Amino acid sequence: MEFKIMSTTDKIEQKVIEMVAEKLNKDKSIITTDSRFIEDLKADSLDTVELMMAIEVEYGIDIPDDEATKIKTVSDVIKYIKERQS
C-alpha cells in the first residue's frame, strides 16, 4: 500500500481548487493553479468577492480589498494564504 504525504502547499492547493470549483460551479478537473478567475473560469465580480470571503473564513485570514484586486489566479490565492500563515 502506498501513502502519499501531502505538503502544506499541496493541501492548500487542493482545498483552494475545491473551493473555486464549488463557488464557481466548475469541475475540479478543469481548474489548475494557472487558472484565471475571470478570463478562464468566467467568474464575475460577485463570484470573486464571495470566493475571497470563503477563503478568509476557511483560513482565518483577512484579504483587504486592495489586496483582493491583485489576486487573479488560483496560484495567487495559494501564495497569499501561505504568506499569511508563515
UniProtKB/Swiss-Prot annotation:
Pathway: Lipid metabolism; fatty acid biosynthesis. Pfam families: PP-binding (PF00550). Residues 10-85 form the Carrier domain. 4'-phosphopantetheine is transferred from CoA to a specific serine of apo-ACP by AcpS. This modification is essential for activity because fatty acids are bound in thioester linkage to the sulfhydryl of the prosthetic group. InterPro entries: ACP, ACP-like_sf, PP-bd_ACP. The keyword Thylakoid does not apply. It is found in: Cytoplasm. The modification O-(pantetheine 4'-phosphoryl)serine is found at residue 45. GO terms for molecular function: acyl binding; acyl carrier activity. It comes from the Bacteria. Coiled coil: none annotated. One of its GO terms (biological process) is lipid A biosynthetic process. The keyword rRNA processing does not apply. Carrier of the growing fatty acid chain in fatty acid biosynthesis. HAMAP family: Acyl_carrier (MF_01217). This is Acyl carrier protein. It comes from Rickettsia massiliae (strain Mtu5).
